[in-house]
Amino acid sequence: MSTPIQKILFGSPGTGKSHRIDQKIIPNVLKIDIGRTPQNIIKTVFHPEYTYGDFIGKLMPITRSGKVEYNFYEGHFLRALAQAYKNIISSYDHKENKIEDTDIENVVLIIDEINRGNSAAIFGSVFQLLDRDDSGWSSYYISINEIEFIKILELIGVEFSYDSHGKVDKYELKPHGSVKLKTFQEKLSFLNFDLINRTIKIPPNLSIVATMNTSDSSIYYMDSAFKRRWEWEFIDIDSKSICFEGIAFKSRPDWEGFIEKLNAFIKSNHKSIRGIEDKQVGYYFIKGDEIKKSCIQNKLMFFLWDSVFNRDKKPLVSLLYGDKNKEHELITFGDFAQQVDTFIEKIKSF
């Protein structure tokens, strides 16, 4: 199990974003063997008619023997989440009551053309799960309804016994026997979900990778809060990823000092910013004791480019080059992303 990826690859059409996911991220970074474990790769495409029901799950009518019945069909996210839980269960050492992290297979949910659907409506409350802690689990949990929770349990292999009122009475997941709810909760405590209150978290072995064509950015608006939950990787027109290696800040105090100066820079350019109150950056915008250059580039610099200075890039031009007449040097985010080292040094000395 590797560190989870939560990233949107973006760039012009035809730059090889999907190819990069299939040929590099899935086999090399996530170590998923598509030939051996195809169930660990779940793909979908967002479009204007794609809904929360397609993503999470929905009740659909079917006719059997002349009678109409309703079945709940899981969506792409629920299927990916259940598969990730299932892989954790299969790596759980029931004798020593511990997880063997190195044995847990990764799962990836791939969303093509994420901005062609109404992302905020499609994700719904799942948006809350996109915040991850240092362990890779969601920082917060959400509650889901009984039908959705039962479907997750079915997908991971749980069998149910029902009482005379049609309510679930006992749960069975091999090698455990059939047990009551409280006992079953204790047996599955390592999955970080609450059977009684029906709460879930995204586990660290579930990555979400999406693609977005910049030419389609106006199809559906993606709000800043949604964008901040992702890393952004720009794919240039030559199909190369602009991603710098190395550590930018080796400690939290260094990072926090940098953020204070960055906010001073942002406030000094308030005339170029609409709604400056929510355009400043908090200390936990990027988490971890060490801050990588790639995170500065793909998350922080993208936020500045796309959300803070989206109306006017002159403050960034002035910061990097000291001359506002060099606007031609900073046309695309790719141009800005190339300047990660210069950007860091300029903010440090601001």
Regions found by a protein language model. Give the residues of each.
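C-terminal regulatory/interaction module of P-loop NTP-utilizing enzymes
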Residues: M1-F350
